[in-house]
Amino acid sequence: MNTRRNRLMMGIGIALALVSLSVPGRAQERSEPTGRDLLTRSKRVLFLGDSITAAGQYVANFDAWLVTELKDQAPKLIDCGLSSETVSGLSEDGHAGGKFPRPDLAERLDRVLKAVQPDLVIACYGINCGIYLPFDESRFGKYQGGMKQLKATVEKAGAKFVVMTPPFYDDVRAPKNFSYNDVLDRFSDWLIGQRKEGWTVIDLHGPMTKAVRERRSTEPQFTVQPDGVHPNDAGHWFIAQQLIKWAGDEKSAAAESPKSLLAARQMPESLLPLVQQRMSVLRDAYVAAAGHLRPGVAKGLPVNEAEAKAEELSKQITTLVSGASK
């Protein structure tokens, strides 16, 4: 009797287990969140990086996609990039003509996180971290350690962490007696390898290197970085495209430019300068509020005034998006 009962209970248990596996959504519940998931679950997204991020153009381009995709559910993007910055804590001799060493993110990170209170942090470092010298294990170790500390600090503050591999370095436009892009290959390969440790990594370096080299096969002078480092409009759009792909929208990421993206979505071009202005107002305010050691950075408005200005711009953005969506 007990044997029959035990067999019956075992059969019921197996059946329930099979049913639970077949219920839609069960597998997804155990999977890692997608880029879109991370964005829709966030109210405030902090961007950290060097001068490329500080310029803010790729952040604004990505924001233009966000506000047309998620509309009033889009998270607020706050750009706190700082020119010359590294996570390696290194600085070459005579940086900036000897006026100041490269700032180290670790010096200001806690203050930035406290000021911004982000739900999600997206960081892009590396092009400055090798200080434009040949590959060296010691410098590489400093970069690895800085990235690990950045991730740990962000997660301790309660935010999710996403990292982009560093951009392409244009050895043709800014030649050295070695390939600095090869150094960044090593940095990028290591970051991609951290995916197996649970890191969320967006690969910018690989696709950017491939795209430039393919274009140069027919246009030898082609570049998206006229000085070898800082992207032009097309370069910033390329970075934004990788973010849009990560967020799951391959179709929009294929647009040739931000204006093409807006046109395809039947959105007015006037949306883009509003998004760019909002980005600039918040960037200048929060970078100044957190404080840093780099001279020559615009102070910006006090945070409360900047937030009020950003809210005015957000209303104009919402009006444009809502009107175009009807």
Enumerate the predicted regions with their spans:
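Bacterial N-terminal signal peptides that target proteins for export
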Residues: N2-I12
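Bacterial N-terminal signal peptides
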Residues: G11-S20
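Conserved catalytic region of serine esterases and O-acyltransferases that act on ester linkages
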Residues: E29, T40-R41, Q57, E197, ...
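Oxyanion-hole/transition-state-stabilizing segment in secreted/luminal serine hydrolases
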Residues: L38, L48, Y58-A60, G89-D93, ...
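Solvent-exposed loop/turn segments at secondary-structure junctions
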Residues: S51-A54, L82-S88, L120, G126-Y132, ...
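A short helix->loop->beta-strand "cap" motif at the edges of active sites that frequently abuts
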Residues: E155-K160, W199
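Substrate-gating cap/lid alpha-helix
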Residues: D171-H205
